[in-house]
């Protein structure tokens, strides 16, 4: 009995069913639409951060509804509130525990520039210890501002090269 190999031959009927894309575009689409933010609620901005999860603002539209409180399960840190020099090493350590790629949003005037606190104990912006991707102004910022910052971060992620940080040499 002779078997035919017709199953392995090319068929022109499947041409319309295949989607061809660059791997970067696919990976960035996944990263954009499934962000896992970790809130660092250090002061009163954390109360406004809670508001984006309710039905009126609905952060789930942007794929970021699941807040993770473990740095190993998150890829976006939202620093909400004033950063003191005493808290800075812990924030940096938590940031270092996050898997790559990772992004940071500085939420509010205190996290962005120190806010109204100009003292020996308060750091003048979290960007002195972390690379900040998006800043949100306001004291405290409105939930619409948080959603706008999330959309700006998603636009930034879409333009990144997804494969450049996959294989880093460890020193």
Swiss-Prot record:
- Reaction(s) catalyzed by this protein? a quinone + NADH + 5 H(+)(in) = a quinol + NAD(+) + 4 H(+)(out)
Q: Which coarse location class describes where this protein primarily resides?
A: membrane
- Can you say where in the cell this protein is located? Cell inner membrane
Q: What class of enzyme is it?
A: translocase
MF (Gene Ontology): 4 iron, 4 sulfur cluster binding; iron ion binding; NADH dehydrogenase (ubiquinone) activity; NADH:ubiquinone reductase (non-electrogenic) activity; quinone binding
Q: Which residues bind [4Fe-4S] cluster?
A: 44-45, 110, 139
Kindly state a single biological-process term from the GO annotations of this entry. Answer: electron transport coupled proton transport
Q: Which InterPro entries match?
A: NADH_UbQ_OxRdtase-like_20kDa, NADH_UQ_OxRdtase_20Kd_su
Q: Which UniProt keywords apply?
A: 4Fe-4S, Cell inner membrane, Cell membrane, Iron, Iron-sulfur, Membrane, Metal-binding, NAD, Quinone, Translocase, Transport, Ubiquinone
Q: Could you say which cofactors this protein requires?
A: [4Fe-4S] cluster
Question: How many cofactor units bind, and how?
Answer: Binds 1 [4Fe-4S] cluster.
The Gene Ontology CC terms held by the record are: plasma membrane; respiratory chain complex I
Q: Which Pfam families match?
A: Oxidored_q6 (PF01058)
Q: How does it sit in the membrane?
A: Peripheral membrane protein
Per the UniProt record, which EC number(s) apply here? 7.1.1.-
Q: Where is the signal peptide?
A: none
Assembly and binders: NDH-1 is composed of 14 different subunits. Subunits NuoB, C, D, E, F, and G constitute the peripheral sector of the complex.
Q: What does this protein do?
A: NDH-1 shuttles electrons from NADH, via FMN and iron-sulfur (Fe-S) centers, to quinones in the respiratory chain. The immediate electron acceptor for the enzyme in this species is believed to be ubiquinone. Couples the redox reaction to proton translocation (for every two electrons transferred, four hydrogen ions are translocated across the cytoplasmic membrane), and thus conserves the redox energy in a proton gradient.
Give the family per the record.
Belongs to the complex I 20 kDa subunit family.
Q: By its UniProt entry, which NCBIfam families does this protein fall under?
A: nuoB_fam (TIGR01957), PRK06411.1 (NF005012), PRK14815.1 (NF011390)
Question: How is this protein named in the record?
Answer: NADH-quinone oxidoreductase subunit B 1
UniProt organism field: Opitutus terrae (strain DSM 11246 / JCM 15787 / PB90-1)
- Gene encoding this chain? nuoB1
């Amino acid at each position: 009995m002779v078997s035919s190999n017709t199953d392995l031959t090319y068929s022109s009927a499947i041409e319309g069913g295949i989607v061809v894309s660059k791997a970067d575009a696919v990976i960035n689409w996944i990263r954009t639409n499934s962000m896992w933010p970790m809130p660092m609620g250090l002061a009163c901005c954390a109360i406004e951060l809670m508001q984006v999860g309710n039905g009126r603002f609905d952060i789930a539209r942007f794929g970021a509804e699941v807040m993770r409180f473990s740095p190993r399960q998150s890829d976006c840190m939202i620093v909400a509130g004033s950063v003191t020099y005493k808290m800075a090493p812990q924030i940096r350590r938590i940031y270092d525990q996050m898997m790559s790629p990772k992004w940071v949003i500085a939420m509010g005037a205190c996290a962005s520039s120190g806010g109204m606190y100009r003292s020996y104990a308060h750091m003048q912006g979290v960007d002195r210890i972390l690379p900040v991707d998006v800043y949100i102004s306001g004291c405290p910022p409105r939930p619409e501002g948080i959603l706008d910052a999330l959309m700006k971060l998603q636009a930034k992620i879409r333009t990144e090269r997804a494969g450049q940080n996959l294989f880093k040499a460890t020193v």
